[in-house]
């Protein structure tokens, strides 16, 4: 497969035209996936593309399954869900320090596929097949060292738990979370898509359309955090292969727990790399990490706080 014309290529963007969904392709040139978020990897690879004067490569989405069939790839060792601002970015960065690990951190194309039902009519079974095929491209054995695969989803992908569990019935689910007061303050300071009404389809998050009409932005954010934690409770009632990780645990301890449940191991060299990396900011690797404690709990977070404490009783 080393001489395959699609080796190192990934589907990175989904668009629509009169013929239906179109898949845009990107050559990764054996670049390692070590950016905090995968859109950073895409920018890096597109820059290399422009230097090679490559043309835009587009195909019908249906080709995804056919082309993925013969790819040598790595099966997932764990799927990481998170409630935002809870240490998942740092954990994924620490995991990516090993050349044996492929870490896919919030891949835009995965989000395009999972939310495609809100834009295009598509059969659920076909969508699951497309998602599995897409993962195979991202999980290619491109250097020969890859043995483990970790998929860190976008925060709202926890609501696709049932679909992802259908695709990967035996893969451990990691549930990362944090005190809602701290998540709320962080998202107020630097908003994410999930914290702004209308950016993510309300029904995906479990809202009725009328439920969010007229909500103040602060109330909306508090409701989203409540929905996230309620979904975690649903998952742990439905699934027997999960790991709850609270942000208040040391990052290295969290990584060790993830490797244990995913039946992987840490080499002495990987541990050394992690001990160095953990001193720095997860999203800004060159910046030393520091954290300022905020004010006491807000009343609008009371329901989320109750759900948070209930989760703590399960760890």
Regions found by a protein language model. Give the residues of each.
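PAPS-dependent sulfotransferases, especially Golgi type II membrane carbohydrate sulfotransferases
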Residues: 1-69, 210-221, 225-315
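PAPS-dependent sulfotransferase catalytic domain
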Residues: 3-234, 249, ...
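Secondary-structure transition/capping residues
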Residues: 102, 145, 175, 194, ...
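A polyampholytic, Gly/Pro-enriched intrinsically disordered region
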Residues: 123-133, 193-206, 287-297
């Amino acid at each position: 497969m080393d001489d395959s014309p699609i080796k190192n290529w990934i589907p990175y963007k989904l668009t629509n035209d009169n013929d239906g969904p179109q898949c845009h392709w990107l050559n990764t040139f054996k670049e390692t996936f070590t950016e905090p978020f995968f859109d950073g990897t895409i920018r890096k690879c597109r820059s290399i593309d422009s230097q090679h004067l490559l043309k835009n490569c587009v195909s019908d989405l249906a080709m995804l399954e056919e082309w993925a069939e013969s790819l040598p790839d790595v099966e997932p060792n764990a799927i990481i869900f998170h409630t935002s601002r809870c240490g998942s970015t740092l954990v994924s960065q620490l995991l990516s320090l090993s050349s044996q690990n492929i870490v896919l951190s919030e891949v835009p194309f995965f989000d395009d596929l999972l939310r495609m039902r809100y834009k295009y009519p598509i059969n659920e079974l076909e969508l699951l097949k497309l998602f599995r095929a897409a993962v195979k491209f991202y999980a290619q054995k491109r250097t020969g060292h890859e043995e483990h695969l970790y998929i860190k989803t976008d925060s709202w992908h926890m609501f696709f738990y049932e679909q992802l569990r259908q695709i990967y019935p035996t893969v451990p689910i990691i549930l990362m979370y944090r005190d809602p007061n701290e998540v709320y303050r962080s998202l107020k300071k630097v908003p994410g898509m999930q914290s702004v009404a209308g950016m993510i389809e309300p029904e995906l998050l479990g809202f009725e359309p009328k439920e969010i009409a007229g909500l103040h932005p602060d109330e909306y954010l508090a409701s989203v955090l409540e929905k996230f934690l309620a979904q975690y409770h649903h998952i742990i009632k439905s699934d027997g292969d999960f790991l709850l990780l609270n942000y208040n645990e040391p990052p290295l301890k969290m990584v060790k727990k993830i490797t244990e449940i995913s039946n992987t191991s840490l080499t002495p060299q990987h541990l050394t790399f992690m001990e160095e990396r953990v001193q720095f900011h997860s999203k800004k690797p060159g910046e030393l990490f520091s954290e300022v404690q905020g004010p006491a709990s807000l009343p609008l977070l009371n329901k989320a706080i109750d759900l948070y404490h209930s989760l703590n009783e399960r760890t």
